[in-house]
Structure formats: structure tokens, C-alpha cells
């Protein structure tokens, strides 16, 4: 990690910048060697897709699916146009937030050659490419929100409150205030990609706000937070060297392990209670328990390679089974549904 890098200053090259007119031993202009190699449009598109960290999109898609399922079971409404528009809007905000994270982690000297995200470190993309792509995605999200306003019965002030609340959370996680760097990132993600996203998908469909979608979002929010916590625990040493503070750094390795297990297994306790007292269909998420134990063993052995990606996969499967369980539950068996 480039510990000598000045915070807020982007240092792309490892050595000194070649001066105008400098040549190598073969007589070639050194400035030409600093340029990125020409790549095909397919390679360029693949680079943009990888920069979005698509493996993390389960944190966006499952809340949208859950909110839509709650709307269907409680009010009997499900407009496919609103479902697609909501999914694209949330994915756009999530992807843009990932790009903001990439940009600011690099500019603060946090990302390095051994980091999981080396989009800027390896010059896969240039900083200005990441910025422009992020602006495009935020704009796309706003366009989708405008379309949702035209199609949904939800009041403008309610739609704007939820949507721009989520957008602000995705940006301020590392941009602006930078909640991630002051141990508040976990709280932001827990709210944004849990209750807020579920409420957004639900309200867009039914045209009103309610409290019960926030309650149903709790198991999914805990699972999503497990993804972030595994990522922060893996990066604990590099984050500490960069001078930032995350929850994983504050509580240390032992309590981080305890917290990860709590986030991992508490949803299963909730599903067991619901399956026992409400509907057996809510036992479907329990099919993913073996995967959860596998992740626990990997965390305990401190083998953090690909742990966030594997936790995100569990988050996706658990969320889908949860949604199917709600849809399959008999009418009146679940509270408010």
C-alpha cells in the first residue's frame, strides 16, 4: 500500500512521470509507454462491468424482490413495469456507489496491488472513466425514478424521500463525509440496502408507505451486512495503515468473528420462528444453512480470499428462498399478509 500517498491526491504511476522529450534506450518516447494499451470495445465493456463489482448486486436485487412480493401478498398488486423500473433504479444507484467507493479508496491510498478491487491500481480504467461512469449511472437512476413517478400511484414527496435517501447513502458511504472511514459505513449499508430498498419497492407498487415492510426486511438486512463486514474484516490491516476506522477495526478480530456469526445465523433463527408459528414455507431459507457453516469455518480460519463474494452468494440464495417462502405462504398466515 502506498502509505506515503497524500490523502485526496490520486497517484497513478509508481515512478516519476516522464518529462517531455525523455526517451528510453531504444529511442522511444517515454510518454507513449505510460499510456494505456489500446483495447477492443468488448474488453472496455468488460472492464466497466467488472468495476461495478456485480457479485455484490444481490444486496440490491433481493430487497426489490422482497418489497414487490410483500406488495403482491398484502395488496394483490404487482406491475411488471414498476418492478423492472425499480430494479434498474436501485441497481444503478448501487453500481454508482461502488464506483464512488473505488475512486475514493484509490485517491486516499487505501487500494493497492493486493487489494480485491484493483480497477484503478492496475489502470484497468482511468479515474476520469470511473467518475464519468458513476455520473452516468446516477443519471440513469434519476431517469428511472422519474419514470416510476409517472407510472406509480406513490406521491412525489414520498418517492423522492426514499430514492434520494438511498442515493445519498450510496454516495456518502465513501464520498463527501465518507461514513466508511469513520466506522459508520455499516450503519449506512444496513439501512440503505435493507429497510430502505424494501420500502422503496413496496411503496412504488402500492402507492403508500407502511411499517411492516421494514420488519420483514430485517433478516435480509442482517445477511447483507454480513457481506460488508466480511469485506471490512478482510481489509482490516490495509485500512488501519491508511488511517481510516471501520467497525471491524474498532472491535478487533475476535469480536468481528462473533459479529459475523451473529449476522450470518440470526436470520435463520428468525426464519425458524416464522416457520414454526406462521407458515412452513418460511423454512425454505434454511436450505442454505450448510453454506453458512462453510462460511463460518472459512472466517474462523482467517481465509478471507473470496469470502465477501461467497457471502454475497449466500445473501442472494437466502433472499430468493425468503421471497419464495412469502409468496407460497397461505393467505392470512403471515402478519399483514
From Swiss-Prot:
UniProt entry keywords in alphabetical sequence: Acetylation, Endoplasmic reticulum, Golgi apparatus, Membrane, Menaquinone biosynthesis, Mitochondrion, Prenyltransferase, Transferase, Transmembrane, Transmembrane helix, Ubiquinone biosynthesis
MF GO annotations: antioxidant activity; prenyltransferase activity
Membrane spanning residue stretches: 82-102, 133-153, 159-179, 187-207, 208-228, 244-266, 276-296, 314-334
Entry-annotated residues carrying N-acetylalanine: 2
Primary location class: endoplasmic reticulum
Biological role: Prenyltransferase that mediates the formation of menaquinone-4 (MK-4) and coenzyme Q10. MK-4 is a vitamin K2 isoform required for endothelial cell development. Mediates the conversion of phylloquinone (PK) into MK-4, probably by cleaving the side chain of phylloquinone (PK) to release 2-methyl-1,4-naphthoquinone (menadione; K3) and then prenylating it with geranylgeranyl pyrophosphate (GGPP) to form MK-4.
Pathway info: Quinol/quinone metabolism; menaquinone biosynthesis; Cofactor biosynthesis; ubiquinone biosynthesis
InterPro entries, A to Z: UbiA_prenyltransferase, UbiA_sf, UBIAD1
Top-level taxon in the UniProt lineage: Eukaryota
Topology term for the membrane: Multi-pass membrane protein
Reactions mediated catalytically: menadiol + (2E,6E,10E)-geranylgeranyl diphosphate = menaquinol-4 + diphosphate; all-trans-decaprenyl diphosphate + 4-hydroxybenzoate = 4-hydroxy-3-(all-trans-decaprenyl)benzoate + diphosphate
Family: Belongs to the UbiA prenyltransferase family.
Phylogenetic lineage: Eukaryota, Metazoa, Chordata, Craniata, Vertebrata
Name of the protein: UbiA prenyltransferase domain-containing protein 1
Subcellular localization, as worded in the UniProt entry: Endoplasmic reticulum membrane; Golgi apparatus membrane; Mitochondrion membrane
